[in-house]
Amino acid sequence: MQLTEQQHDKLSKVQLDESWKHSLAEFLVSSRMDELRQFLIEQKNQDKVIYPPSKQIFNALNTTPLSAVKVVILGQDPYHGPNQANGLSFSVQKGIVLPPSLRNIFHELNTDLGIPVPKHGDLTKWADQGVLLLNSVLTVEAGQPTSHQKRGWEQFTDSIIDVLNEQREHVVFILWGAYAQRKGQRIDREKHLVLKAAHPSPLAANRGGFFGCKVFSKTNNYLKQHGIEPIDWQLDA
């Protein structure tokens, strides 16, 4: 699309990896994004605490450029507790107690690949290798789960999925739970691999359908079949 001078100026102020910025430009300069920005400004003006910190809102995109994406793990919205969210879905800062969903993910990782259960929950190493850890909604108010849903983030992250769907091939989309699976209906199964399972939260996982899903080995097998370097899922101590 042809951008006006005003739109170019607006785009230049977005602190986002250039490959993503270029591909998402149409949304980033849209009225929907303006409304989302205004909502976040109003929240901060009301002294509401927003997670993750503003510099980490686009952490998933800035850590995993468009050309590097091999895998997408789609979450819902960020953790809403202090010092948990770091802009990567399911990930928490080092030194933070593992949330139940992440404990279950690590349990499945251990069962699937025999990898020792990590002692911390910082998934940056995965993101550095091409695992886009993307939440559907990128911000949340402290202590208020789902508080920033239906404010525009969903359309933004739909655009991210559309860009990957159209511009890339042989990406593995890991969709845990009904919410992620609905969002993933737009993915072209001819070009990409979609792996579905129950959500790793204790409530969902204990009903069955998560443990034993073997998404980690299935992901690496698919990548290797297409000549793509597999993911080293083992996290540093």
UniProtKB/Swiss-Prot annotation:
It is found in: Cytoplasm. It comes from the Bacteria. Its main location: cytoplasm. The keyword Cytoplasm applies. Coiled coil: none annotated. The active site is at D77 (proton acceptor). GO terms for biological process: base-excision repair, AP site formation via deaminated base removal. It is an enzyme of class 3 (hydrolase). GO terms for molecular function: uracil DNA N-glycosylase activity. Keywords: Cytoplasm, DNA damage, DNA repair, Hydrolase. PROSITE patterns: U_DNA_GLYCOSYLASE (PS00130). Pfam families: UDG. InterPro entries: UDG_fam1 (IPR002043), Ura-DNA_Glyclase_AS (IPR018085), Uracil-DNA_glycosylase-like (IPR005122), Uracil-DNA_glycosylase-like_sf (IPR036895). Belongs to the uracil-DNA glycosylase (UDG) superfamily. UNG family. PANTHER family: URACIL-DNA GLYCOSYLASE. NCBIfam families: PRK05254.1-1, PRK05254.1-2, PRK05254.1-4, PRK05254.1-5, ung. This is Uracil-DNA glycosylase. It comes from Acinetobacter baylyi (strain ATCC 33305 / BD413 / ADP1). The lineage of its organism: Bacteria, Pseudomonadati, Pseudomonadota, Gammaproteobacteria, Moraxellales. The gene is ung.
